[in-house]
């Protein structure tokens, strides 16, 4: 166990935050030993798996950071068109998707290029371009932090929702995911519904894309919209897309006929948070050159809103986590003032 470790390499925002205690887990036995020794009970504990969806609000984390770095991918079973694959929690998510696509396995290709680790994916129920983790999730193994005992969680027990799971709410901090099992297919229809995908394929003359071509297209689309975290700190999409009642949406549509939307079950409508942010703005704040009345491209010294995607908040260096928190609050207020919609963070605030 190390003391006073700077977490800058362990969070994609690139903020300096000091962990009072820090331990890297490379084997499940190490985690169980840590629990047996009572270390997780002694300290306020943060389980960190990649750090790509975390915002440290303070300069010091007065507790223990447990960084999960276990590796391994194995085939559990293969039968006809289906294959069950297990990935350890510390596996890099984009690498795992790339591996599966390279094998010709369908089910997670639209989730390509989402930064993070496999173990964090179920916590957030990551999703993109019409696909969510829960669609291919079979089960996961997790260790209870109080006892060190291993438990298997089925899809139903995980209570997946939009960027939600039982690990993010009711059981937050009580379990550490150690591996995830995926049910994938050797042949399946590709999800090509989203406009960005259609436009990219058309632009590149691809009429009937292969699994690999779809994967590569999504990687290219994400690269065109998101900053390279090695150059500019960010956590990808900072806010969730709000889901509103159809009545509220119809009222908005009368005023904003071009508002994009996606129909949801039970009479709900999902509205892109990026569009709402881009079409509201910091009218009472100093604006970046060329930003007009939109948040898109807005900058306030160390932090700002990415110029290519209003949903992404960025850290240019030299700032603090609280700078992002304050910017997020201003954006939330401006969206609610203009559209009457509350947007909430997708990023985990620590």
What are these regions (language model features)?
Residues 1-147, 151:
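Anion-binding (especially nucleotide phosphate/pyrophosphate-binding) glycine-rich loop
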Residues 105, 321-327:
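Beta-rich strand-turn-strand
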Residues 2-3, 8-12, 150-313, 318-322, ...:
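Phosphate/pyrophosphate- and phosphate-bearing ligand-binding catalytic cores of soluble enzymes
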Residues 335:
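Conserved ATP-binding N-box helix of the HATPase_c
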Residues 331:
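Phosphate/pyrophosphate-binding loops and the adjoining catalytic core of nucleotide-dependent enzymes
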Residues 31-35, 97-100, 198, 215-218, ...:
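A generic alpha-helix structural signal
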Residues 30, 92, 269, 327-328:
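Residue-level preference for nonpolar/small residues embedded in alpha-helices
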